[in-house]
Amino acid sequence: MLHISFLGVAQHCHILKERENNVLKKSPIYSSHENQIYLLDSKIEINEQLSADICHMVLNCPEIAATAKPGQFIHIRCSDGLSPLLRRPISIAMADIDTGTIEIIYRVVGEGTKILARKKKGETLDIMGPLGKGFPIPEGIKFPAIVGGGIGVAPLLFLAKAINTANKRETAGIIFAGFSSDDETFGTFFMEDCGFKLEICTDDGSRGYKGFPTDLLEKYINDREIENDTASVNSSKEIIGPMSPHVEIKAGGKNAIDIIYACGPKPLLAKVKSIAAGAGIPACLSLEERMACGVGACLGCAVKSAEGGYMKVCKDGPVFEASQVEI
């Protein structure tokens, strides 16, 4: 533990030194072929309350807006003092190169986010990012499913926009979004504007389906299998002779899901992983873990790898292929 703490302190001191040398020049404190990380004082353009404990903030930071990818996050220093000492990791809900802004949606749950909620337009925040590995968008995907729960819906807005831009199709895919109640829903109009069919769930039934988004995901996949099963049997008789309908299903059908993206609490991610594995559909999961350093130094966010050992959510993730991690 002493060794890990020393690494965290050393990394923090290194960042402070780099900040003095580089931030005024707006150059990245870290750069690789995959990512550039900036440490910036970012001006708050908007900080508004969406519901009782959910807030939306817009930050002016052209460097991060130009390089951020869906699924990545920023590390925010909430206070100039020592309390809270650690930065808060918050996913990027949107990035706009034209305006040079990024957006975050956060839940007020502790000291750090309470301080964030009190910040005013025109104030600045010390932020580091973009951090982590985001969602892959493979070429050739035809009908992705996006599954989000609670505040985990936030980074999926950015993903929906990116998929819409890449696909340029009338129907980009389907989104299953779960919230506690209608009062806590957000981003719904935007998701529909991105061309996605939207299914909303609430725990109390105040809007949409009463239950979990994974219930609807499972039902959707099962319904498509039944439809494609019938279609495959009919076509096999006419064209190619007897063949297992199961093979035809794997080849896809109308609006058959070919990849699943998910972000939310662990029970949701575990269920998505199980559903995807059973249906033979690849899935990418964005994990939520407490983070201290945000750059892989302190090992505080380690999760078990499916192949043995551990992986760091902040650096190796937060997005992983479902088969890579144990949940």
Predicted regions and their residues:
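Local cysteine-cluster metal-coordination motifs and their immediate loop/turn environment
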Residues: 266-267, 288-317
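Ferredoxin-reductase
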Residues: 29-121
